[in-house]
């Protein structure tokens, strides 16, 4: 077990005292960085990048070499699991992901099975390689986060065959054939648990479940078709490895209505989008979980003074409900590819500067 130079992120997830508020950014390794685009060009395609452990390691470390971030996140894609199920994933230029064999019929659903994790070995090799690359002077720079899509979010792509504006195909199945939908979700939950456990075995020190499309569901349907299956995933997770606790984060975009339910999933932390008031979220969850978030990503297109002001507003909102511990700063969703890299430097600087100042004033 290599000691960490900076364990602030892990301590915040455990709601332990920290000297400042740690931060990382969703999609921190991405198209807003010129060095990422150069590596992707060498890889030839997005999947060529994501399925090559050496390239995945290179792009995972790029934002850490540019900014003093407090965690690394595995460079991969949420659709690796359904790809391993044989649905035929591809990425068309400018169109996003597509599955050649979506789940549309009862026969399609009956054939679905938890994939052999050996088919995802490239992901676990990347985790191990990133862990090695993070070691500097005998100590690991920051912790590494592993991740997966949620069972429901994966199902949206698996049934729709790609992205969707209205999710009418997957929702038609959910309302009309809930038995088929539950079968897909049950298999997905088993697969995601196994997938995250294999990432933990390979060296992930925290894991996150991205429920990107949970917010598309009606109240009641969310609890039955998304929340229940994230709870299943969490129940199947190894929460300790190599003598260390492995914190788990759940994030439902558009999930502000269901914070109490998310706090009861067994997760250590809840990710929040920018529509949620942090002080209210803290009161509603009763301090049972850490909170992660939640600045609007488009703030990064504003002038420096406005970015700094908005950062302070997020930190003040969290602190208003009782001190600054138990908070990981992040965006409310992934960083835009058009974000100026220098704006990210401003955000990182202000989070670290002002959160230290807040702790001093809190005594």
UniProtKB/Swiss-Prot annotation:
Disulfide bonding pattern of the chain: none
Database matches in PANTHER family: METHYLTETRAHYDROFOLATE:HOMOCYSTEINE METHYLTRANSFERASE RELATED, UROPORPHYRINOGEN DECARBOXYLASE
Pfam families named among the record's database cross-references: URO-D
GO BP terms: protoporphyrinogen IX biosynthetic process from glutamate
Species per Swiss-Prot/TrEMBL record: Cupriavidus pinatubonensis (strain JMP 134 / LMG 1197) (Cupriavidus necator (strain JMP 134))
Enzyme class: lyase
Alphabetical keyword list: Cytoplasm, Decarboxylase, Lyase, Porphyrin biosynthesis
Residue(s) at site: Transition state stabilizer: 77
GO CC annotation, single: cytosol
Cytoplasm recorded as keyword: yes
Function: Catalyzes the decarboxylation of four acetate groups of uroporphyrinogen-III to yield coproporphyrinogen-III.
Residues annotated as binding substrate: 27-31, 77, 157, 212, 333
Reactions the enzyme catalyzes: uroporphyrinogen III + 4 H(+) = coproporphyrinogen III + 4 CO2
Family to which the UniProt record says this protein belongs: Belongs to the uroporphyrinogen decarboxylase family.
Pathway entry: Porphyrin-containing compound metabolism; protoporphyrin-IX biosynthesis; coproporphyrinogen-III from 5-aminolevulinate: step 4/4
GO molecular function terms listed in the Swiss-Prot or TrEMBL record: uroporphyrinogen decarboxylase activity
SUPFAM superfamilies associated with the record: UROD/MetE-like (SSF51726)
Name of the molecule in the record: Uroporphyrinogen decarboxylase
HAMAP family: URO_D (MF_00218)
Subunit record text: Homodimer.
Location of the protein in the cell: Cytoplasm
